[in-house]
Amino acid sequence: MMPILVTLNKISVTFGSRRVLNDISLSLRPGKILTLLGPNGAGKSTLVRVVLGLIPPSSGSLVREPGLRIGYVPQKLHLDATLPLTVSRFMRLKPGVKKADILPALTRVQAAHLLDQPMQKLSGGENQRVLLARALLNRPQLLVLDEPTQGVDVNGQLALYDLIEQLRKELGCAVLMVSHDLHLVMAKTDEVLCLNQHICCSGAPEVVSTHPEFIAMFGNRGAEQLAVYRHNHNHRHDLHGKIILKNSGSRGA
């Protein structure tokens, strides 16, 4: 039986008199991608913080595998525009990082050419790849991605999702991903959890897409996007949006 890296059992989180999460149960397993969907204010980021151990649940239990290595890509990175910070220096700010590990991590996400570039000059897609490379430095068993394609154009989104799937296969890690991108993300997702303070519905994308609570939340168009897009591609996209056929070289989009 596949081991479980993280188990949440009937988790609730309350801030003052306001209940943000109510009765949440889920499991994260190696090699599986779980995507959290939900409207703004649904509690997605709070749930991520619980999984990361940044905030304790008000009730319920959280069990993590001892010594679990987690890589985290935050929703936003705010940097002082006047701060001289290259990608290399930014990577070294992570505790315990060896200089020799930085270039291989960037190479893994097709961003080695950014090593000496200022962080503030990166595009949205380049920035997310650097954050992902930084998250890989501790060889994570669990990757937590909070809106990884925010501020990234469509080609960049496709490239990032292809990369996430590739890393999942190479590392065998679990992936917990928060996303609003119904049409794009579902092709790579094993399980969808639809959240609005509580779990409205969960399961495989094709199952969730027909659930009445999902349709009430995202509408019929959301249901169509979730159900229709789940198919195999014969290509992937590189950092610059170029199409790379799986059994050949590359060509322009």
From Swiss-Prot:
<dbReference type="GO" id="GO:0016887">
    <property type="term" value="F:ATP hydrolysis activity"/>
</dbReference>
<dbReference type="InterPro" id="IPR003439">
    <property type="entry name" value="ABC_transporter-like_ATP-bd"/>
</dbReference>
<protein>
    <recommendedName>
        <fullName>Zinc import ATP-binding protein ZnuC</fullName>
        <ecNumber>7.2.2.20</ecNumber>
    </recommendedName>
</protein>
<comment type="similarity">
    <text>Belongs to the ABC transporter superfamily. Zinc importer (TC 3.A.1.15.5) family.</text>
</comment>
<feature type="binding site">
    <location>
        <begin position="38"/>
        <end position="45"/>
    </location>
    <ligand>
        <name>ATP</name>
    </ligand>
</feature>
<dbReference type="GO" id="GO:0043190">
    <property type="term" value="C:ATP-binding cassette (ABC) transporter complex"/>
</dbReference>
<dbReference type="InterPro" id="IPR027417">
    <property type="entry name" value="P-loop_NTPase"/>
</dbReference>
<dbReference type="InterPro" id="IPR003593">
    <property type="entry name" value="AAA+_ATPase"/>
</dbReference>
<keyword id="KW-0472">Membrane</keyword>
<dbReference type="Pfam" id="PF00005">
    <property type="entry name" value="ABC_tran"/>
</dbReference>
<keyword id="KW-0067">ATP-binding</keyword>
<keyword id="KW-0406">Ion transport</keyword>
<dbReference type="InterPro" id="IPR050153">
    <property type="entry name" value="Metal_Ion_Import_ABC"/>
</dbReference>
<comment type="function">
    <text>Part of the ABC transporter complex ZnuABC involved in zinc import. Responsible for energy coupling to the transport system.</text>
</comment>
<keyword id="KW-1278">Translocase</keyword>
<comment type="subunit">
    <text>The complex is composed of two ATP-binding proteins (ZnuC), two transmembrane proteins (ZnuB) and a solute-binding protein (ZnuA).</text>
</comment>
<dbReference type="GO" id="GO:0005524">
    <property type="term" value="F:ATP binding"/>
</dbReference>
<keyword id="KW-0864">Zinc transport</keyword>
<feature type="domain" description="ABC transporter">
    <location>
        <begin position="6"/>
        <end position="227"/>
    </location>
</feature>
<keyword id="KW-0813">Transport</keyword>
<dbReference type="GO" id="GO:0042626">
    <property type="term" value="F:ATPase-coupled transmembrane transporter activity"/>
</dbReference>
<keyword id="KW-0997">Cell inner membrane</keyword>
<keyword id="KW-0862">Zinc</keyword>
<dbReference type="GO" id="GO:0015633">
    <property type="term" value="F:ABC-type zinc transporter activity"/>
</dbReference>
<dbReference type="GO" id="GO:0010043">
    <property type="term" value="P:response to zinc ion"/>
</dbReference>
<keyword id="KW-1003">Cell membrane</keyword>
<keyword id="KW-0547">Nucleotide-binding</keyword>
